Swiss-Prot record:
Higher taxonomy: Archaea, Methanobacteriati, Methanobacteriota, Methanomada group, Methanococci
Cofactor details (free text): Binds 1 NAD(+) per subunit.
EC number from the UniProt entry: 3.13.1.9
UniProt KW Hydrolase keyword: yes
Cofactor list: NAD(+)
Record's protein name: S-inosyl-L-homocysteine hydrolase
Temperature curve summary: Optimum temperature is about 70 degrees Celsius.
One GO molecular-function entry: adenosylhomocysteinase activity
Any one annotated GO CC term: cytosol
Other remarks in the entry: SAH is a product of SAM methyltransferases and is known to be a feedback inhibitor of these enzymes. As a result of this inhibition, organisms have evolved efficient enzymes to metabolize SAH via different pathways. The pathway found in methanogens differs from the canonical pathway, it uses the deamination of S-adenosyl-L-homocysteine to form S-inosyl-L-homocysteine for the regeneration of SAM from S-adenosyl-L-homocysteine.
Top-rank taxon, per record: Archaea
Binding residues annotated for substrate, in chain numbering: 123, 148, 178, 182
Organism name: Methanocaldococcus jannaschii (strain ATCC 43067 / DSM 2661 / JAL-1 / JCM 10045 / NBRC 100440) (Methanococcus jannaschii)
This protein's UniProt keywords: Cytoplasm, Hydrolase, NAD, One-carbon metabolism
């Protein structure tokens, strides 16, 4: 079963998938093993991820491992219709199209759950949220889940703290081979890529304000600086603010940054990072972009209330005319890298989705002894993925000698 925009788009989607596959060597190795061992035979996996080419490679990997796949998007604007069609053509149950309404978005999540999955793979926790609220009749069938992103992990840990979480979830986001690369290098490149594609403007010479200095914010600030921008960071955490300053960036409150910024990029995972009092202080022509999971980091309601007129001036660019100035919002305030571009680079998602595939296998093999809480990815898995990635890149590294290992384990040898 499938509900996509146009199944006839599948050939173009397949071309994108094949291109991504060529640049995802770690996941390819896992797929070959899954194809032979069929660990997911008889298992249904429900997925809510950004439905584009790299995600399709992950879904295909799980399918090769014997799984029945039911998949939808995790954001109304991130699905690529040709890729969704290609996934449907492969025999997956696909319910997704770009430009879904909020109602359609949740209907599609529910359609995935109608397949009664044994394992869920989520990005943002909306699928898991539904299971714990409106689809509780399915909980007994769930072995466990995997969560991809920072925003979802924040929600899951809040659920765990309240005792509301009913099954184990693997924290893929905090794997070293995920957040150190996906969040930093992936978001850093793809967020700027989305802004450049949407606006066709020069970054050099502009003041770019980055809200949040977690791994995503670090990456965005680094890439904006590399393109010639003056970068300002806003933070609520004094340690991260200090780190940003030591990294060479100006640090100030958003109310001050609002007065000098040309481009604003939110990377916090929190709501109302840019709101009315900030918008009122912004320059004419200020550009707002969000690189966080949900579309509430920039308060769109405040923009709408302040605007005398609203119109789309370019694909992915909405102009809010406040009378005395114009403010531009990219991608409707949703993930700029996916709403306005193709998301993270293939090589980065290779590691992230290798973690997802192996985390799903870990759930399958260990669910009976796992408690209903959030679990970290095993460190051995991180090391294996990093080693495979280095090998694919043609890089060799040193190994400790026996004497070095002994030295590191012996407390007696000192000065």
């Amino acid at each position: 079963m499938y509900e996509v925009r146009d199944i006839n788009l599948w050939k173009e989607g397949e071309r994108k998938i094949q291109w991504a596959k060529q640049h995802m060597p770690v996941l390819n190795l896992i797929r070959e093993r899954f194809k032979e061992e069929k660990p997911f035979k008889g298992i249904t996996i429900g997925m809510a991820l950004h439905l584009e080419a790299k995600t399709a490679v992950l879904a295909e990997t799980l399918m090769e491992g014997g799984a029945e796949i039911a998949i939808t998007g995790c954001n109304p604007l991130s699905t690529q219709d040709d890729v969704a069609a290609a996934c449907a053509k492969k025999g997956m149950h696909v319910y997704a199209w770009r430009g879904e309404t909020v109602e359609e978005y949740y209907e599609n999540l529910n359609k995935v759950l109608d397949h009664k999955p044994d394992i869920v793979i989520d990005d943002g926790c909306d699928l898991i949220f539904l299971l714990h609220t409106k689809r509780t009749e399915l909980l007994d069938n769930i072995m466990g889940g995997c969560e991809e992103t920072t925003t979802g992990i924040i929600r899951l840990k809040a659920m765990e703290k309240e005792g509301a979480l009913k099954f184990p979830v693997m924290d893929v986001n905090d794997a070293y081979t995920k957040h150190l690369f996906d969040n930093r290098y992936g978001t850093g490149q793809s967020a700027l890529d989305g802004i450049l594609r949407a606006t066709n403007l020069l970054i050099a010479g502009k003041t770019v304000v980055v809200a949040g200095y977690g791994w995503c914010g670090r990456g965005v600030a680094m890439r904006a600086k590399g393109l010639g921008a003056e970068v300002v960071v806003t933070e609520v955490n004094p340690i991260r603010a200090l780190e940003a300053r030591m990294d060479g960036f100006r640090v100030m409150k958003m109310e001050k940054a609002a007065e000098i910024g040309d481009i604003f990029i939110t990377t916090t995972g929190c709501k109302d990072v840019i709101r009315k009092e900030h918008i009122l202080k912004m320059r004419n022509g200020a550009i707002l972009a969000n690189a966080g999971h949900f579309d509430n980091e920039i308060n769109k309601k405040h923009l709408e209330e302040l605007a005398k007129s609203i119109k789309e001036v370019r694909n992915c660019v909405t102009e809010y005319d406040l009378g005395n100035k114009k403010i531009y919002l990219l991608g409707e305030g949703r993930l700029v890298n996916l709403a306005c571009a193709d998301g993270h680079p293939c090589e980065v998602m290779d590691m992230s989705f290798a973690n997802q595939a192996l985390a799903a296998e870990y759930i399958l093999k260990n669910h009976e002894k796992l408690e209903p809480r959030v679990y970290n990815i095993p460190y051995e898995q991180d090391l294996m993925i990093a080693s495979l990635k280095l090998k694919a890149m043609g890089i060799e590294i040193d190994e400790l000698t026996k004497e070095q290992k002994k030295y590191l384990e012996d407390w007696r040898e000192g000065t």
